[in-house]
């Protein structure tokens, strides 16, 4: 399918270890800060790659932890699997293009991007934190994975392998209404440009 935005960032994934024709595209949108745990997501990604799962994880955002995250990417050798896209005025096409939206936060209030990903019909995986059960209905419109690198990688690997669960969640997302239809229309308008 042709994507309605600049996909040149996907070239960064070329030549990755265990490359397949159809990699799993993971997306995260968020501030590069300690609570959002983008630095830890690099290690989650490495564990998935070590399990021979062909993932391409791209992150839309910016923030004070960018150097820390870039250092983690270099130290783990994940340059071909974990890419920082940078700040984008319109993150919706990036969310729409992924297979699974991942919110790897250490803690979170209410992640608006999780709801936006659900509105866009994306399977969602979030880490367990005090308010995570208010974000989604576990196993129905997303999954909650452990809030540590090893457990999150294990939970994400199981979810990636379980295509039936992903499809069941996507079906739930199609039939649920997450709020104001005008907001949904705005998101689709933003995607279409």
Regions picked out by a protein language model, each given a short descriptive name:
Residues 87, 106:
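Aromatic "clamp/platform" in nucleotide-sugar-dependent glycosyltransferases that forms part
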Residues 123-127:
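Short hydrophobic beta-strand element within catalytic cores of glycosyltransferases
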Residues 147, 164-192:
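A charged, aromatic-enriched C-terminal amphipathic alpha-helix characteristic of glycosyltransferases
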Residues 18-36, 42-45:
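Conserved donor-binding/catalytic core segment of Leloir-type glycosyltransferases
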Residues 138-139, 143-149, 158-163:
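Conserved acidic donor-binding segment of nucleotide-sugar-dependent glycosyltransferases
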Residues 116, 129-139, 143-144:
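Short acidic/histidine- and often glycine-rich active-site loop of Leloir-type glycosyltransferases
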Residues 70-86:
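Nucleotide-activated donor-binding/catalytic signature segment of Leloir-type glycosyltransferases, i.e.
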């Amino acid at each position: 399918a042709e994507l309605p935005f600049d996909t040149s960032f996907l070239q960064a994934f070329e030549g990755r270890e265990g490359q397949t024709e159809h990699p799993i595209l993971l997306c995260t949108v968020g501030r590069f800060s300690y609570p959002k745990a983008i630095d830890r997501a690099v290690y989650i990604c490495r564990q998935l790659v070590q399990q021979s799962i062909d993932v391409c994880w791209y992150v839309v955002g910016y923030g004070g932890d960018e150097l820390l995250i870039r250092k983690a990417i270099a130290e783990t050798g994940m340059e071909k699997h974990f890419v920082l896209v940078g700040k984008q005025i319109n993150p919706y096409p990036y969310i729409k293009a992924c297979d699974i939206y991942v919110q790897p936060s250490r803690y979170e209030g209410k992640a608006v991007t999780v709801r936006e990903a659900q509105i866009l019909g994306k399977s969602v995986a979030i880490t367990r934190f005090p308010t995570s059960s208010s974000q989604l209905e576990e196993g129905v419109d997303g999954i909650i994975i452990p809030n540590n690198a090893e457990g999150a990688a294990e939970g994400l690997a199981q979810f990636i392998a379980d295509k039936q669960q992903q499809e069941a969640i996507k079906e739930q997302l199609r039939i649920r209404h997450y709020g104001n239809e005008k907001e949904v229309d705005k998101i689709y308008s933003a995607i279409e440009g």
